[in-house]
Protein backbone atom coordinates (compact mmCIF):
# COMPACT_ATOMS: atom_id res chain seq x y z
CA UNK A 1 0.00 0.00 0.00
CA UNK A 2 1.29 3.44 -0.93
CA UNK A 3 1.56 6.20 1.63
CA UNK A 4 -0.60 8.96 0.22
CA UNK A 5 -0.01 12.52 1.28
CA UNK A 6 -2.76 13.99 3.44
CA UNK A 7 -4.84 16.53 1.54
CA UNK A 8 -4.22 20.16 2.46
CA UNK A 9 -7.64 21.38 1.31
CA UNK A 10 -11.05 20.07 2.34
CA UNK A 11 -14.36 19.57 0.59
CA UNK A 12 -16.19 22.88 0.58
CA UNK A 13 -13.08 25.07 0.66
CA UNK A 14 -12.57 27.74 -2.00
CA UNK A 15 -9.19 27.54 -3.73
CA UNK A 16 -7.51 29.25 -6.67
CA UNK A 17 -5.01 28.09 -9.26
CA UNK A 18 -1.49 29.40 -8.74
CA UNK A 19 -0.82 29.97 -12.45
CA UNK A 20 -4.18 30.32 -14.23
CA UNK A 21 -6.98 32.80 -13.49
CA UNK A 22 -9.62 30.53 -12.03
CA UNK A 23 -10.95 29.55 -8.65
CA UNK A 24 -13.39 26.96 -7.40
CA UNK A 25 -14.89 25.03 -4.56
CA UNK A 26 -13.54 21.55 -3.76
CA UNK A 27 -16.22 18.86 -4.17
CA UNK A 28 -14.08 15.69 -4.25
CA UNK A 29 -10.48 14.66 -3.58
CA UNK A 30 -8.38 11.83 -5.04
CA UNK A 31 -5.46 10.83 -2.78
CA UNK A 32 -3.30 10.58 -5.91
CA UNK A 33 -3.68 11.13 -9.66
CA UNK A 34 -6.67 9.24 -11.07
CA UNK A 35 -7.14 10.60 -14.59
CA UNK A 36 -5.74 9.60 -17.99
CA UNK A 37 -2.12 9.82 -19.05
CA UNK A 38 -3.30 11.94 -21.99
CA UNK A 39 -4.80 14.50 -19.61
CA UNK A 40 -1.60 14.63 -17.55
CA UNK A 41 0.54 15.15 -20.66
CA UNK A 42 -1.74 18.03 -21.75
CA UNK A 43 -0.55 20.06 -18.73
CA UNK A 44 2.42 22.29 -19.62
CA UNK A 45 5.64 20.58 -18.55
CA UNK A 46 6.71 23.60 -16.48
CA UNK A 47 3.78 23.07 -14.08
CA UNK A 48 3.04 19.36 -14.73
CA UNK A 49 2.46 17.73 -11.36
CA UNK A 50 3.69 14.43 -10.05
CA UNK A 51 1.02 11.74 -9.64
CA UNK A 52 1.73 11.00 -5.97
CA UNK A 53 -0.15 13.91 -4.41
CA UNK A 54 -3.80 14.79 -3.82
CA UNK A 55 -5.84 15.93 -6.82
CA UNK A 56 -8.94 18.03 -6.38
CA UNK A 57 -12.22 18.09 -8.29
CA UNK A 58 -13.42 21.69 -8.39
CA UNK A 59 -16.59 23.48 -9.37
CA UNK A 60 -14.49 26.12 -11.08
CA UNK A 61 -15.12 29.51 -12.62
CA UNK A 62 -13.24 32.30 -14.31
CA UNK A 63 -14.35 35.63 -15.76
CA UNK A 64 -15.87 33.93 -18.82
CA UNK A 65 -17.36 30.58 -17.82
CA UNK A 66 -17.81 27.87 -15.22
CA UNK A 67 -16.73 24.25 -15.47
CA UNK A 68 -15.36 21.24 -13.59
CA UNK A 69 -11.59 21.27 -13.06
CA UNK A 70 -9.17 18.55 -11.92
CA UNK A 71 -6.10 20.12 -10.30
CA UNK A 72 -3.06 18.92 -8.35
CA UNK A 73 -2.41 20.17 -4.86
CA UNK A 74 0.92 21.75 -5.91
CA UNK A 75 -0.94 24.06 -8.31
CA UNK A 76 -3.56 25.29 -5.83
CA UNK A 77 -3.66 27.75 -2.96
CA UNK A 78 -6.37 28.90 -0.61
CA UNK A 79 -8.52 31.70 -2.03
CA UNK A 80 -8.75 34.50 0.52
CA UNK A 81 -10.76 36.96 -1.58
CA UNK A 82 -13.98 36.41 0.41
CA UNK A 83 -15.82 36.50 -2.94
CA UNK A 84 -18.52 33.82 -3.33
CA UNK A 85 -18.39 31.11 -5.98
CA UNK A 86 -21.43 31.46 -8.26
CA UNK A 87 -21.16 28.12 -10.11
CA UNK A 88 -24.64 26.93 -11.18
CA UNK A 89 -24.07 23.43 -9.76
CA UNK A 90 -23.90 24.89 -6.24
CA UNK A 91 -27.53 26.02 -6.35
Which role fits each region the language model picked out?
Residues 48-91:
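Intrinsically disordered, low-complexity, charged/polar segments
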Residues 33-42:
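Short, solvent-exposed secondary-structure boundary/capping segments
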Residues 26-28, 60:
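Residue-level recognition of conserved beta-strand positions in structured domain cores
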Residues 15, 25-26, 71, 85:
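Extended aliphatic helical segments
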Residues 14, 47-48:
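Beta-strand elements of modular eukaryotic interaction domains
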Residues 22, 39-40, 55-56:
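Broad hydrophobic/π-residue packing in well-ordered secondary structure
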Residues 1-14, 19-23, 30-33:
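Mixed-charge, Lys/Arg-rich low-complexity intrinsically disordered regions
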Amino acid sequence: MKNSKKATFNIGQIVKHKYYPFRGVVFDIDPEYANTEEYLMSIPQKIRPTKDQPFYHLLAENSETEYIAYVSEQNLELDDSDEPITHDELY
